[in-house]
Amino acid sequence: IDFAKAYADAKFHFDTFRTQGNELLEQAQDAFSESRNMRLAAQFSAQAMVYFYHTLYYVYHGLEFDSHDPVIMHDRMRTLSTKLMLAFDDTHIENIFTLPRLKSFLMKAPYGIRFDIAPQKLEIHMERVRKAGGIIENLCGLRLELYKELSERQ
């Protein structure tokens, strides 16, 4: 494996799509807090999560993800980190429906005339996306460090 190339490709992908995910998350927060536009906030949050998972997949595997479904993406990537696994897993106290909700946001927020969500629920989902984005950023950073270290040994 050419680790210098793997590092360069992964770093480019990381810088591009992590930035887009973070920008969408900021736009979601603005839509939520400034204009109270739940539809845009939901759509942008869900799309940010998709970008974060695409980034993680590419950094770890060097390939594009073949899905844009947050439920499938999480299921395939969750074993990379217990923190990531626990960010969306149910507890003995509550069932966490964030991933299925994000999936529905991707389809229903832009196109569904009857789309509606309580602001309190959306805020919880947005916070989980923010938390997962941070976890993914840290995981990618560790992987990029490994690629760089291995490329220096070649």
Label each region the model flagged.
Residues D2-D30, Y57-Q154:
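Long, charged low-complexity segments
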Residues M38-Y58:
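Short, hydrophobic, well-ordered secondary-structure elements
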